[in-house]
């Protein structure tokens, strides 16, 4: 039967390794500790693929920021994958510590309900303002992403106008913001759309999924207030948040997409395509429908000529950008904090590769 991620269900493979990897599982207590030990019989050992010198890896989830950083300071831990942003300057100034950082593949963006005829959690009755391109543009232009980068993210973000990491797929023309920040321009677009005094709506945000996720939403709410949009922030733990997303119980929400796969198809098919009940568009929670865009995505799925496929995908992303179906914000710059003796390779999927870890 399918694995139930929402209840934390583990599969047989979670605890019983198949014996072909560089490490074997010695111990696992869910949400407590996992211990991996170097496997001398791994086939890559003979080919020199084991470049690190760590024989045993111990993973300890520690929810409290203070406890986690105290464990690093006392050498109880050698490396922390998610140090609090406010601690980064102090860690960088400490000769006993080291900070390695890089931009994630994941893009954070706003999703707007473009399916309902009447917007939920709003004072607008009988219509949905988010279906109007001018309203979506107004919201986009009201957001000062540079201020979010500086004040909320403490410099650890990379603003983007794209739904994908552009440097990894050679689409640099998508990187700049689609429209410049401008309060006056945003107000004009709202007035043109029939909302000269703005309107009310609500944004759903996780408070423990992305870096400073709740603070991002609060900052955006303050920015939208300047153009007349009264936006309430409804922040919650990610388990509750994703349940609301699954049930479409929202009108606007913060979301992130990315991972180890860098091919644009892994964004186009599940996120950009409309929901067809067959797997495409399963994560298109804004539920817009654009038949021309769907055709481009479907063409890209089967096109074998690489230059032609790249051109099709670029056209699809341009259409998303021009219609403001999503409102891209930034990519997180993820810092890893460690003892100075540790050497690692930072990965854009925010995953540590034990094979490359060295202790000097």
Segments the model singles out, each with a brief description of its role:
Residues 1-20, 44-54, 91-102, 107, ...:
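Short, solvent-exposed loop/beta-turn-alpha elements that line the ligand-binding surface or hinge
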Residues 11-14, 41-90, 133, 230-232:
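Ligand-site clamp/hinge motif
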Residues 19, 150-153, 192-208, 252-257, ...:
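Bilobed periplasmic-binding protein-like "clamshell/Venus-flytrap" ligand-binding domains
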Residues 21-24, 34-35, 54-61, 108, ...:
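Short, well-ordered beta-strand elements
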Residues 22-24, 141, 158-192, 209-215:
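Structural transition elements
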Residues 26-37, 60-122:
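Extracellular/periplasmic solute-recognition and catalytic clefts
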Residues 78, 96-99, 216, 222-276, ...:
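Periplasmic binding protein-like
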Residues 87, 124-168, 212-216, 320-325:
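Periplasmic-binding protein-like
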